[in-house]
Amino acid sequence: MVSTTTFLMLTSLATLTSARSHLTVTIGSNCTLKGPQGGHVFWWRIYDNGWFTKPCDQPGRFFCNGRDLTIINVTANDKGFYYGTDYKSSLDYNIIVLPSTTPPPRTTTFSSSSVANNTISNPTFAALLKRTVNNSTTSHTTISTSTISIIAAVTIGISILVFTITYYACCYRKDKHKGDPLLRFDI
């Protein structure tokens, strides 16, 4: 029962791919994954074939300080999905490993100091800001990823339950002569 619950939990977590943070790391470097700000964080590594491990149980390869997970000397085998939770909140990472000869992807950083160099006129900027605010409000017609993951977990649970009941009904069907005498209504 515990393995089924764990499987359902990790299956529902796997459906949350759109909320996953993608990190690109080069081979030989160290990578620190920040955990939720709550209490003690439990980390899981989820493989493509459905297996999962606790990286904090592997000293020397990983370093856990109770909240963050550091992957020491990243190798090509460290690519994959890492999930950290304190059972109140969670963070999900997808680690992409590049060879050390490949330059890291170019990142662009925006800062608040760029507002002084604004070339957009005030009315245009106000219209653009209004349009952005109107478009960024959440629509009531979209379904959040957490709702989809809960629905997926419930569907899998119900299908396992139906399969178990069907299996029991087909394989353990009692004959007429083997029935419980208290449940027979023969008079």
UniProtKB/Swiss-Prot annotation:
Entry keyword annotation includes Zinc: no
Disulfide bonds: none
Domain of life according to the entry: Viruses
Native source organism of the sequence: Human adenovirus B serotype 35 (HAdV-35)
Residues with glycosylation annotation: N30, N73, N117, N134, N135
Keyword Glycoprotein: yes
Family per similarity comment: Belongs to the adenoviridae E3_20 family.
Record lineage: Viruses, Varidnaviria, Bamfordvirae, Preplasmiviricota, Tectiliviricetes
Keyword annotations: Early protein, Glycoprotein
Protein name, UniProt field: Early E3 20.6 kDa glycoprotein
